[in-house]
């Protein structure tokens, strides 16, 4: 058990400002929705977490999505094991910025790090009062979120609500799983590269043998 607990996973949340990243982190770590003061950035948090009988030390890093933090934000990416990339289900602009802004930024500063795509504020997507107060706003559908996951190559797509706590734990369970149990495609790629390496070695060996024979 001690050796399992020593496995450290750095999880960094990324996405536009005001999509609910900080609320999601507070909800996950305190099991309650913040109703008073909500900080711009959540303090770094670390705790032992058990997922699928495996204990890991999960470190959570929050980032500010506003342009004012564009220079400082990438400093948090160093050493990241997984990114939780969030957009609001009731903000199409934040959804579109996943491809426009966040994927290019992550590919530049942290290429190859797995991503869990998250649609936040799930409770508001079906809230009739909220929709009436925001005429013309078209929520992001589950199908559109799943399509975006495929486009960016994210390991998971999860919709959650910090206010109701729906699926919040599932977001970070998925982030842990993608590190300790990489998706099948990633494992297959590694095996394929290994097989290709072996076949190349065998090919070179064959050429050497034929040279010696002649």
Swiss-Prot record:
Any one GO biological process: actin filament organization
SMART domains: RAB (SM00175), RAS (SM00173), RHO (SM00174)
Gene Ontology molecular-function annotations: GTP binding; GTPase activity; protein kinase binding
Effector region, short sequence motif: residues: 37-45
Pfam families found in the cross-reference section: Ras
Record: residues binding GTP: 15-22, 62-66, 120-123
PROSITE patterns: RHO
Alphabetically ordered keywords of this record: Cytoplasm, GTP-binding, Lipoprotein, Membrane, Nucleotide-binding, Palmitate
SUPFAM superfamilies xref list: P-loop containing nucleoside triphosphate hydrolases
GO CC, any one term: cytoplasmic vesicle
Compartment(s): Cytoplasm; Membrane
Post-translational note: May be palmitoylated.
Membrane topology: Peripheral membrane protein
NCBIfam families named in the record: small_GTP
Recorded family membership: Belongs to the small GTPase superfamily. Rho family.
Function of the molecule: Inactive GDP-bound Rho GTPases reside in the cytosol, are found in a complex with Rho GDP-dissociation inhibitors (Rho GDIs), and are released from the GDI protein in order to translocate to membranes upon activation.
PANTHER family tied to this protein: RHO FAMILY GTPASE
Annotated protein name in UniProt: Rac-like GTP-binding protein 3
Taxonomic source organism: Oryza sativa subsp. japonica
